[in-house]
Amino acid sequence: MENFKVKAELEINVTQEDVDDIVTTALEGGINYWCRKAEVVGDYLGEYASEQISRGGTLKLYDSDGDKVHELTRDKLLDGIKKYCEDTERPYDIMYAGVNSVGCSTGEYGLDCCMVDATVADMIIQYAVMGEIVYD
């Protein structure tokens, strides 16, 4: 019997809290080996720098390798999440499928940020600001 592959595109619901959690994890240890400094652009939009992105702000990330400066925005972070989820060699699956009261799929997907450790947050940020994994 012959098998066939079909490529499907999923839509993933990402909450403001998910964005805050990913950026917090990245800033508190995920990206510290290649990012020497993170700086809020403009006014703080939340209490912490990690809340800047989910509220539509920008963070400047200063690369420890030379004079490179990367700007992280919400759109870039969402693209980084997309690229991470498409990476077939990703260390963890961070998506979950929504189910109804009888256990059937609702066709909706979300992020399980309990699966986003420093490695995953780093990969998402690298995909977001560099388009690929540069440092590992």
Regions from the language model: what does each represent?
Residues 1-69:
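Long, contiguous N-terminal structural blocks used for assembly/anchoring
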Residues 10-22, 68, 72-79, 111-120:
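Alpha-helix boundary/N-cap detector
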Residues 22-26, 44, 76, 80-84, ...:
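Charge-rich, solvent-exposed alpha-helical interaction surfaces
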Residues 25-29, 33, 51, 83-91, ...:
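Surface-exposed polar/charged interaction patches
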Residues 36, 45, 101-107, 116:
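Short interaction-hotspot residues at assembly and binding interfaces
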Residues 58, 64-66, 70-88:
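Short alpha-helical interface patches
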Residues 74-80, 91, 95, 101-108:
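Acidic, low-complexity, intrinsically disordered interaction modules
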Residues 109-135:
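Acidic, proline/glycine-rich low-complexity IDRs
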